């Protein structure tokens, strides 16, 4: 049993490393993620201790997910994100609830890994500008795709085991 548990945690660790390797983010995207999180944390430092705020950006779009203890922090996150330069649009999906458990976060990582693997197998992920974030089984898809690519990608995401919902924040190519 100890060996299986060790293997499980090793797989979780390796999958997290691989997810990071597949990022298409620019330096500006990473900077906006860090600045937004700092601004939110500095505004209400005592409340943020009980918060789980995740910020992802892609081509100027900023996605905020996670859990916060009060509704006011949801609004604050959007306000702070909108003060940054080079932010085209803010998508705030924060939820007022307790922080996600370790098991839930691990499951979300596995869902993201599974989706990326399936997209690569079908050559839908190759050289495409997309970013996938999973929170509580809800998959957020960011990037730029043509309509047909988007439909195929969303269908694949929705049929992936463990996915509760798929939310497209994709900008369609014309």
What does each model-found stretch correspond to?
Residues 2-7, 12-174:
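N-terminal targeting leaders
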């Amino acid at each position: 049993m100890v060996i299986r548990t060790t293997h499980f945690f090793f797989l979780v660790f390796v999958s997290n490393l691989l997810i990071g390797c597949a990022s298409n983010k620019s330096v500006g995207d990473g900077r906006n993620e860090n600045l937004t999180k700092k601004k939110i944390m500095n505004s209400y430092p005592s409340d943020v201790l009980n918060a789980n705020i995740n910020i992802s950006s892609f081509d100027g779009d900023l996605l905020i997910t996670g859990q916060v203890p009060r509704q006011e922090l949801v609004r604050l996150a959007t306000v702070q994100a909108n003060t940054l330069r080079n932010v085209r649009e803010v998508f705030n999906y924060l939820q007022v609830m307790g922080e996600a458990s370790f098991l839930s976060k691990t499951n979300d990582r596995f869902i993201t890994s599974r989706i990326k693997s399936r997209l690569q197998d079908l050559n839908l992920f190759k050289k495409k500008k997309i970013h996938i974030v999973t929170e509580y089984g809800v998959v957020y898809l960011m990037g730029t795709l043509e309509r047909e690519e988007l439909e195929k990608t969303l269908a694949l995401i929705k049929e992936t085991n463990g996915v509760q919902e798929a939310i497209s924040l994709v900008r369609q190519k014309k």
